[in-house]
Amino acid sequence: MKILIVTQYYSPEQFQINEIAPELVRRGHEVTVLCGVPNYPKGIVFQGYETADNCKQKEREYYKQTGVRVIHAKQHPRGHNPFSLLRNYFSFVKNSKEVIRNLSPNFDVVLGYQLSPITSMYAAVEYKKLYGTPLMYYTLDLWPVSAESILKSSKNPLMLPVTWMSRKIYQSADRILVTSLPFMDYLSRVNGIERERMGYLPQHAGGGMMLMDLQKETHNGCADFMFAGNLGKGQRIDVIVNAAAELGARTDYKVHIVGDGSMRSSLETMVKEKGLTNNVVFYGNQKRDDMPSFYKKADVLLITLRGNNEVGNTMPGKLQMYMTTGKPILGAINGAANEVIKEAECGACVDAGNYKGLADLMKSYIESPEKYKDCGANARRYFTEHFTFEHYMNGLERELQTLIAK
């Protein structure tokens, strides 16, 4: 297959599509990725990508390494304010569509790796309009509901055109794969997508840590909890901080927060105001290859997500990654993730936003860790049965081939 992947975010930005595209090449397919100039999450262009010539050099190097042809569309960096973020969104729409008009008409299929914003898929829609090529989305973020976090309210007057735009973009697809089953209900109800046009393909996680011994290196008489990932508003890390505040400034636990994002500064302020600087530690972004050494510090992994709309029913890819570590998982999260944690018997979960309930779970581990002794093995077993990279790639390849054959 000749596959065109459209995604606003790609390597060296850390998203799972970075593993998917090279694997498609290894399976014998020709892959081109159209993406933006990397600047996520800090809103600053990555070193080595500052100019068009720099990007061309990086594209040549990446092709030699992976066989994936990458084309960077110019875009305004995300910056640090809503105006700059909107410029980022719209500049990618404009410039990615210009790139599309200069591409070969010979692709067999277009795969839109659909994160936020939904406008990042306009280039994929443009290619389909020009050449009639079948279009598939892999939908990780739901729209228009995801726009509520940007517009601050579902009652914002701008939600009306955003809803119209989202419907048009989704309805342009021939096939939509979703990462969580509740997505199907929302896409059908809000965007008018027929059930037969949708399929379920949960995110994968690399299995590299499955065979690693990530048991805690030293038993320091302290329960070490860890959150690893994006520190955005939707992740509700404030629930973890408030849970720590319920436990208080005691010496028998620590919370390690590994990652970066728009809420980091306010979370650090929150920790200081609550007198928890000895209990809650921030490490910033870390390279993926360095993460095993961080997981070794942890007894338990924490997962939280906003729960006031359909976004809170998703199953973040973080959950699958956590499962590969063989650690118990405690969560304050709704929907599919809540169900999987309970079904896998890999930890315990309360509803999204319930910081007191999460504090009770953390206290339970601190006082009786033996209750969770089988959770890590259960997590790895469930992952092997449902979430391996090979399982994911077989499903994606099959879906693409079926769509082309129609």
Segments from the language model and where they lie:
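Donor nucleotide-sugar binding/catalytic pocket of nucleotide-sugar-dependent glycosyltransferases
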Residues: 156-213, 220, 280-282
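Acidic donor-binding loop of glycosyltransferase active sites
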Residues: 174, 279, 295-312, 327
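N-terminal subdomain of nucleotide-sugar transferases
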Residues: 1-57
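Conserved donor-binding/catalytic core segment of Leloir-type glycosyltransferases
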Residues: 218-244, 256
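A short, well-ordered alpha-helix in the C-terminal region of glycosyltransferases
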Residues: 357, 364, 371-386
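Nucleotide-activated donor-binding/catalytic signature segment of Leloir-type glycosyltransferases, i.e.
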Residues: 256-258, 265-292
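An aromatic- and histidine-rich active-site surface loop
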Residues: 14, 86-96, 109-146
